[in-house]
Amino acid sequence: MADSLAPVRRANIIGVGLIGGSIALGLREIGWHVTGEDRDPATNALAIELAVLDKIGFDADAEITFVATPVGAVVEAAQRALAASTGVVT
């Protein structure tokens, strides 16, 4: 569990399917604040309902962004994340 005096660590997830959702859940379990988005609005709604994500969108100040999109969308998603983020994009 995260130390309550430590700053909250923040991450982005782009693509909240099986892989992205699993990463998000793992991060949330250890106390990270996770912002994310999926191309499917229904997936976004479900991710909030099931507490997979804390928030829908993109946190430009997150320390890391995980790109978990289908292969054909990786380049565009990574380019957008790199342009909008000050953190690591993987």
Kindly give the residue locations of the regions a language model identified.
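NAD(P)+-binding Rossmann beta1-loop-alpha1 motif at the extreme N-terminus of oxidoreductases
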Residues: 2-56
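Rossmann-like NAD(P)-binding element
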Residues: 58-89
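A broadly tuned preference for mixed-charge, low-complexity surface segments
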Residues: 1-2, 90
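Generic enzyme active-site microenvironment
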Residues: 36, 89-90
